[in-house]
């Protein structure tokens, strides 16, 4: 990425808060760089947290509702779960939403950089990318690093 010049706004983190801030700043005419440590936009919420959980919970809800229909005279056999298909369904939802965020970033002319950001000064950050380190200068920075996923105790990995 050619990072000559100074960015008006750098946003660290591309979760719901980060990409919304980046898009709004761009809509207001700012030159915006969105930095995400993962390869895909969306942060923990989209890639490993809220959205995957909701996709799986939706399946459970449908199965539960189908089982309760027997009370009103509609019966189904015992459910059979194809874990591979369920995983593919979840991954498809994530992929579609990742693509949507990427398209919105492109349409709004928000530049995206994959890497881990750390502050060098109050107007410069260092981004560790797969291609090497990049120094980024900015006027304003929004830290939207969000959350990190955690494992529940006593639940096997």
Where do the language-model regions lie?
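Residues forming the Rossmann-fold NAD(P)(H) cofactor-binding site
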Residues: 19
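Glycine-rich Rossmann-fold phosphate-binding loop(s) that bind the pyrophosphate
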Residues: 13-16
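Glycine-rich flavin
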Residues: 2-7, 23-30, 36-157
């Amino acid at each position: 990425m050619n990072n000559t010049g100074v960015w008006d706004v750098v946003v660290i983190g591309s979760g719901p808060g980060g990409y919304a801030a980046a898009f709004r700043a761009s809509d207001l005419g700012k030159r915006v760089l969105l930095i995400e440590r993962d390869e895909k936009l969306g942060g923990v919420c989209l890639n490993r947290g809220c959205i995957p959980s909701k996709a799986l919970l939706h399946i459970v809800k449908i199965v539960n509702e189908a089982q309760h229909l027997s009370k009103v005279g509609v019966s189904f056999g015992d459910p059979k779960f194809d874990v591979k298909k369920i995983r593919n369904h979840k991954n498809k939802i994530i992929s579609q939403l990742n693509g949507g965020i990427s398209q919105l970033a492109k349409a709004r002319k928000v530049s995206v950089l994959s890497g881990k950001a750390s502050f060098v000064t109050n107007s410069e950050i260092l981004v560790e990318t797969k291609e090497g380190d990049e120094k980024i200068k900015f006027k304003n920075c929004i830290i939207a690093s969000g959350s990190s996923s955690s494992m529940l105790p006593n639940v096997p990995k």
